[in-house]
């Protein structure tokens, strides 16, 4: 059973480590050192909660082509999921989802808006 405290812990992880994908990836879609800290926290959370299933969603802004943005976001989501699998989390408990620029949370007319749209989301799968 997934409880509100688990959801709150996921939200807290993102608040502590940030949601910007720039925090997690370099220009070659490799994880930055900061990403490992957050992902290791997710491993511990998932080990404590064996029923927890998680989607890692990666979003981009609208710069570049929609196809390229979708590809890079899916690649980044899969890189994060692969790390969790390599740390012992069963693949059936994880989903990697690249959204590209399809779900903006801000406008794309300024750098600050685009930066908000380039983000990582952790979503509980029911």
Model-found features: residue ranges?
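Periplasmic OmpA-like peptidoglycan-binding domain that tethers envelope proteins to the cell wall
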Residues: 29-36, 57-126
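Periplasmic peptidoglycan-binding/tethering modules of Gram-negative envelope proteins
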Residues: 1-53
